[in-house]
């Protein structure tokens, strides 16, 4: 089952940057699916202060 990660790149998500919730679009997104388990879509976000963080932004059934 192929997942289109492009659809995740166009949405904004709430992420926590230095204790504040900020709405950001991911810089990059990829699928993380360990063997024998359901997968998740991980997004890479760049906070306004320069920090980068990862967050699960979707589930694969």
UniProtKB/Swiss-Prot annotation:
GO terms for molecular function: double-stranded DNA binding. Signal peptide: none annotated. The keyword DNA-binding applies. Its main location: cytoplasm. It is found in: Chromosome; Cytoplasm. InterPro entries: Cren7_sf, dsDNA-bd_Cren7. Coiled coil: none annotated. GO terms for cellular component: chromosome; cytoplasm. Gene3D superfamilies: Chromatin protein Cren7. Methylated at multiple sites, to varying extents. Keywords: Chromosome, Cytoplasm, DNA-binding, Methylation. Monomer. A chromatin protein, binds double-stranded DNA without sequence specificity. Constrains negative DNA supercoils. Belongs to the Cren7 family. HAMAP family: Chromatin_Cren7. This is Chromatin protein Cren7. It comes from Caldivirga maquilingensis (strain ATCC 700844 / DSM 13496 / JCM 10307 / IC-167).
């Amino acid at each position: 089952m192929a997942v289109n990660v492009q659809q995740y790149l166009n949405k904004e998500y709430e992420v926590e940057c230095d204790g504040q919730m900020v709405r950001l679009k991911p810089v990059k997104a990829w699928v993380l699916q360990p063997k024998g388990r359901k997968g998740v879509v991980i997004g890479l976000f760049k906070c306004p202060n320069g920090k980068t963080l990862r967050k699960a932004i979707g589930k694969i059934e």
